[in-house]
Amino acid sequence: MAIHNRDKFLSNLAANLGRPRKTEGVERPEYSVQPQYEVLKGASQDELIDVLEKHCEVIHTDFVRTSKQELPHVVRQTIERYEAKSIIASNDKRNAEYGMDQAYNQFAEELDMHIWDASIGKENQVIAEKADVGISFSDITLAESGTVTLKNDKDNGRSISLMPKSYIAIIPKETLVPRMTQAAKQIHDDHMNGIQTPSSVCFVTGPSNSADIEMNLIVGVHGPVNVTYIVVD
């Protein structure tokens, strides 16, 4: 991305501060108090899962814990509970690892099953809009707030978790972190290590919730009405 007028802007800012512009020797300050690192510090993965499960009750999200072997069966049960007839899922490399590629092939025998296909462009969004359920993997999962982090790219469109009536997030156990602090650091570290960050990183916390000035809660206005988190050991 091109940068325009940066030097002019910074020089003008320094002049208004009454000092020369600093171009080197600038370091991020170390704050004496950093409580963000103390929340759930030292918690095990199982303890973080317990925190996530408890918070799912607050954010109106169904929580299921299962094994990798049972995942396709649990996903199928969830789809049936939602009475879904059409599904859209991400074209994630983890589909094969977790047995979901075979599961999707089986679903396609009875349901309208679509795997995100970069070659058809915006047609994916049209399909997502009509789908009953969207399914994708969480890349980083925040236990404290019950948030899944979705790194959207050409094989994992944002529409999967946004447009269908219901959404299923598959959460590998190892993606659990205490809170936003660790998620932000992980994304930052990836960038500093030369790992390309997707243009869209979405933090999704349960179903869409909106409230007016009288605190009347309305679910599903800006996203899914139903959300299920499936944690996989």
Curated annotation (Swiss-Prot):
Domain of life (superkingdom): Bacteria
Any one GO BP annotation for this protein: lactate metabolic process
Pfam family, one: LUD_dom
Cited function: Is involved in L-lactate degradation and allows cells to grow with lactate as the sole carbon source.
Membership in a protein family: Belongs to the LutC/YkgG family.
Official protein name in the record: Lactate utilization protein C
Annotated organism of origin: Oceanobacillus iheyensis (strain DSM 14371 / CIP 107618 / JCM 11309 / KCTC 3954 / HTE831)
